[in-house]
Amino acid sequence: MNDKLNYKLLNIPDQLGEEAIKTLSQEPEIKNTLEFIQKTDILVFGIGKAEEMAKRRRIPEDKVNEILSKGAVGEAFGHYFNEEGEIVYKLNTVGIDLETFKNIKESIAIFAGKRKVDALIAMTNINKNIVLVTDEENGYKILEELN
C-alpha cells in the first residue's frame, strides 16, 4: 500500500537517548524514511492535549507537572506548546520536527474531542497552513472559541 500511496511510516519509540537516536538514524531504512520526511509535500497528523499525551508517553509525574506549569495545552511531534504556540518542552524523538512541519505544503490535522480545542487553536499559532478534518460539533466549538 505504501508504494501505491507513496507514504512512509516511522515506527520508533517516542523517547530515546541521544546515542540510541544517533544509532537508529543511521540504519538504512530509517535513514531513508528520515530523508523522505524532509521532502514530503503532505502530512497527516494528530494533535493531542498536553496532559493526556504526556501520560500516554509515560512521562514521569513530576515532569508532567513541570510541563503543565509552563502552560502547555497541546502536543504534536513530541513538542509541548502553550496557547501562543510557544514550545515549552520537547521530547527526544526521531522523525518530523516543527521546522519541517512549518515547511510542508499541505498539513492535514485529524482532530476529535472538544477537550482538545485549545490545543488545536494553539497549533495554528505554530503553523496557520493547516487543513482540519473534524466533526460538526468540534467545528462549532472552534468557531465559538475564535469569536
Task: Explain the meaning of each model-derived region.
Residues M1-N147:
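Conserved phosphate- and dinucleotide-binding cores of soluble alpha/beta proteins
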